[in-house]
Amino acid sequence: MSTNRRIGATDSKSRAHLLDVAERMLLEEGYAAVTSRKLGARAEVSPQLVHYYFRTMDELFVEVFRRRAEESLQRVAEALAEDGSLVSVWELTSNPLGARFNLEFAALANHRKAISAEIAAYGERFRQLQHAAIAARFDELGISAEELPPT
């Protein structure tokens, strides 16, 4: 028997605040510290409000990851459009805070399939961006991809 439970608006300021606080907690204390009760207390809302916006903690974690992943992909696309330099892309994606974020989500993905699937989808999109940039650079230089060994 399914219920028609209400879910909060995805563009709500309260929802965005919960995502911000959850991300801070994740980076400061690790993913295990992010529970609906602790998140509610830190965000100064009830745990029920957390579940009003996110049916499950998996849904919350996916949204935290997705938000940063989308920002990352956007920054990478902009860097490639500006100068086409892969160095600028790699500099963008190799900051310590980003590394900590990715490590927490990698650890979380060991226990939650939804997170694992989201990371895989992001990885594929990021790979496609890099592939397109490398292929374009090869074309500019008149290099055939077949001329270079993969290693």
What is each PLM-predicted segment?
Residues 63, 70-100, 150-151:
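Hydrophobic alpha-helical connector segments
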Residues 142-151:
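Short, intrinsically disordered, charge-balanced linker/junction segments flanking boundaries
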Residues 1-13, 24, 143-144:
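N-terminal intrinsically disordered/low-complexity leader segments
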Residues 73-74, 94-103, 113-142:
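Amphipathic alpha-helical packing segments from all-alpha helical-bundle domains
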Residues 22, 89, 102-106:
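Generic hydrophobic alpha-helical segments
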Residues 52, 91-94, 107, 111:
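Amphipathic alpha-helical interaction elements
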Residues 57, 64-68, 126:
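The DNA-recognition helices of helix-turn-helix-type DNA-binding domains
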